[in-house]
Amino acid sequence: MTPFMTEDFLLDTEFARRLYHDYAKDQPIFDYHCHLPPQQIAEDYRFKNLYDIWLKGDHYKWRAMRTNGVAERLCTGDASDREKFDAWAATVPHTIGNPLYHWTHLELRRPFGITGKLLSPSTADEIWNECNELLAQDNFSARGIMQQMNVKMVGTTDDPIDSLEHHAEIAKDGSFTIKVLPSWRPDKAFNIEQATFNDYMAKLGEVSDTDIRRFADLQTALTKRLDHFAAHGCKVSDHALDVVMFAEANEAELDSILARRLAGEPLSEHEVAQFKTAVLVFLGAEYARRGWVQQYHIGALRNNNLRQFKLLGPDVGFDSINDRPMAEELSKLLSKQNEENLLPKTILYCLNPRDNEVLGTMIGNFQGEGMPGKMQFGSGWWFNDQKDGMERQMTQLAQLGLLSRFVGMLTDSRSFLSYTRHEYFRRILCQMIGRWVEAGEAPADINLLGEMVKNICFNNARDYFAIELN
């Protein structure tokens, strides 16, 4: 019987253990996509307690707690921090088989150093007190934890109208060497069908000093904000493409669509597709000219529980996997961006694992001469961000493309404790390659495979995003 979560956790061959301990474990972290609040990094925020750093805002945990019958007041409601933590501690023993069980105990191990102890109601007091004592120390501040975890770069997720003042403040502080850069997330300028679109256009027009009436005005406003982001070191964009659409339109049609929407008129699905296509093609060309990377997160079905959406708002754990077809529209969109050789470096993520092979083959259609891995099939995302999801994604990438050119893991998280997801990924990667070696499917060449592992863990992302590190 193998003990739970030793230093050789998941490393079930000698070759995997060598790969992880000698090549993967000590690689720095390049976390190119996350949802950390830049204000907390700028202020070097001190966490009040374990709830504040661990459960607050974590919709993964809330979903598990709800499934365990926990009342909403103990998830997102007005219960005390300790009551919410106790509700989570009572849920954890029921999460065996869910990645939350592994994540929870990895996060207690690093950075808190808690090993040999499982979170449950009987250990809740001890773990709460021990972690809170550590959180009072300087090296457990927001920046302190990032430094402990050997982070070199994080890419936050930011709206085009954001001032980026916190990024500027961080950049000016020469004592803090981790790069904290904005990522451009223009969903609100793109989702013309949303009720909030007109209000957002007014805000975008104000910050860009542009009167947005025609499509060219929107392009001008977005270009000004792209320049603003570039001035703050941005090299990455991110788009939530819940449904991939494609329909072409001329400028007069786009002007009419935008004008009618700004006048409060409803649009047809075809008109929505025309507008979204034009925005994505325009932005893709801008990214290509600037050397940016674009990310497409495809296939979420959001806000399914309308009653809870009205009570609690979005992003609180009521989203799931969509099953809309996407291959044909995605192909047309990428091909259109590529017509003038203005398809930027692109990472494609799918939420439905059914679509893994769709993306794994799609990226091969648009690779770039002289640019290894220009088109990437992104790491297992959201509901696929677990052991078999990551194994599936990497196995299919290896079979359909080049795993050796993969840019690797990202946290996609709102928590400063989620850096252990990189450790989890690295262990799974080494386990997978070790099994290939054990089965005679890959050579037992530790230098060849060790270098490949180092590249996937850090070097490929550093080179791909072309961000100068301190």
Swiss-Prot record:
The record ties this protein, via HAMAP family, to: UxaC (MF_00675)
Keyword terms: Isomerase
Fetch the Pfam families from UniProt.
Answer: UxaC
Which regions span the lipid bilayer?
A: none
What GO biological process, any one, is recorded here?
D-galacturonate catabolic process
Pathway(s) it belongs to:
Carbohydrate metabolism; pentose and glucuronate interconversion
Q: Which reaction does it catalyse?
A: D-glucuronate = D-fructuronate; aldehydo-D-galacturonate = keto-D-tagaturonate
Query: Where is the secretion signal located?
Result: none
The entry sums up its family as follows: Belongs to the metallo-dependent hydrolases superfamily. Uronate isomerase family.
What name is this protein filed under?
A: Uronate isomerase
Query: Which EC number(s) does the record attach to this protein?
Result: 5.3.1.12
Q: InterPro entries from the entry?
A: Metal_Hydrolase, Uronate_isomerase
Q: Name one GO molecular function term.
A: glucuronate isomerase activity
